[in-house]
């Protein structure tokens, strides 16, 4: 679990691929709610390829891990690592916040996993269903770790 102390009751599994969802149309991630400032840990070993600010994600860390999977951590209050740093699974990379388009919500980590190699068989007729080739269900990943 990328948020210290979080459990399955800290998120709603029905929010992955939820439609409609504002500017992003479909929610392709899971929001893990916690007290602002709670540590966020890398859920994988890998290379931090982006650490900075994005308009919608706010303070963001992007880690590329095994199988060319990108782990996206957004709405962070603080970023605790530098870009192009190797991180270990469980290493603190930031803290839970509400930056970017989450300023009017409860503090949470917006977490997603994307693959660089498309899984074409996952495409369907849902809104933005073609993106299912790239976005993996992070809840399935969390439950196996």
What is each of the regions a protein language model found here?
Residues 42-80, 106-110:
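Zn2+-dependent peptidoglycan hydrolase active-site motif and core
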Residues 82-91, 112-145:
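Acidic, glycine-rich catalytic/binding loops that coordinate metals and/or anionic ligands
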Residues 22-32, 63-67, 113-125:
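Small beta-barrel nucleic-acid-binding modules, principally OB-folds
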Residues 37, 45, 66-68, 99, ...:
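Solvent-exposed coil/turn segments that connect beta secondary-structure elements
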């Amino acid at each position: 679990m990328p948020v210290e102390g979080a459990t399955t009751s800290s998120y709603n599994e029905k929010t992955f691929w939820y439609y409609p969802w504002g500017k992003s149309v479909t929610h392709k991630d899971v929001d893990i709610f916690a007290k602002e400032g709670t540590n966020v840990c890398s859920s994988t070993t890998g290379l931090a390829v982006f650490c900075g600010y994005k308009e919608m994600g706010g303070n963001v860390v992007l880690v590329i891990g095994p199988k060319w999977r990108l782990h996206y951590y957004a709405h962070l209050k603080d970023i605790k690592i530098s870009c192009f740093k190797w991180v270990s699974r469980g290493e603190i990379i930031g803290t839970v916040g509400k930056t970017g388009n989450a300023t009017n919500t409860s503090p949470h980590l917006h977490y997603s996993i994307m693959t660089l190699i498309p899984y074409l068989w996952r495409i369907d007729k849902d809104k933005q269903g073609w993106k299912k080739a790239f976005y993996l269900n992070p809840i399935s990943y969390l439950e196996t770790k």
